[in-house]
């Protein structure tokens, strides 16, 4: 048995790193950039921090902003046509997971036109060619899409999210600059931060976990637990910590997969447009309780990484409870709702459960589950 580990060719970290965007484009010989960013980031001047760098370097670019939260097949199709018309030879993706996921899908289809039907990319797509080179500049500290081989596109006709896994979609360069994240409001900071914690915890206990991924996930849990409260208050230390912590979590989970927290969160985004991080944060503690019997001593490690003292002297039940309690407390401290009562309609539970069971993240869960058990988990959160 052997394991594969895929990362960016190059990554930049720290305040001011955004300057590296122009340096990389020039060094790689690209002539024109296709800049993919959502309308709000353009409206509030966040994307301008990157395009100013391009302007100063005399690099030609074309903007594409037809991107919505939980990006759709239509967004991707529009992007493919816009890219073809642009004459660009690289993509600069600015934003959170929505911008980067859209950019990945566009880049894959451009280089693998036989997959022009976006639905054909669901699951592990057998593409043959690397996507258009992507330079990814995250503006949120959560999805880690800048370092993952995953992307998620919403099929609006079927009210479902498609998880796509493709080693050919990883950005060649990640530029992780905490200054690009400083304009995030508290609610978005909290939601994306809890998404990052979910990545780290699910990645640590997933069936595919191994020594190398464990190393990244435990460190990510530690960094995020120390940094998220400060990031919500917009402290420089908190922002910098979350920028690093979410990236480290991405280094891990991208290579080993996730579990049913994400499986349950994806249908909520597709059906109700629930922010992905909020859905994960609400679901995580309950699923941790459900998964506990299948995690050996890993919850002891999680509790310790989150700052719980005395874990070495705790019983199995005690350290498992301590880990779950630490997650619940962090979510509460940053203002995450405690349940799904305001989101889920009772008549939708069976559809949600079936969608969660069919989701690509479900097989990696440490505890095998069923549609009925997933339905019960949803109900327990209502």
What are the functions of these language-model segments?
Residues 42-115, 229-239:
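N-terminal small/polar loop signature for handling phosphorylated ligands or for N-terminal nucleophile
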Residues 1-64, 381:
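An N-terminal, well-structured beta->alpha segment
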Residues 299, 309-382:
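C-terminal charged capping/lid subdomain of soluble metabolic enzymes
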Residues 74-179:
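Glycine/threonine-rich beta-strand-loop-alpha-helix active-site module
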Residues 150-256:
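Carboxylate- and glycine-rich phosphate/diphosphate-binding segment that chelates Mg2+/Mn2+
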Residues 18-21, 43-46, 73-76, 99-103, ...:
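Short glycine/serine/threonine-rich phosphate/pyrophosphate-binding segments
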Residues 267-306:
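Catalytic phosphate/nucleotide-handling subdomain of diverse soluble enzymes
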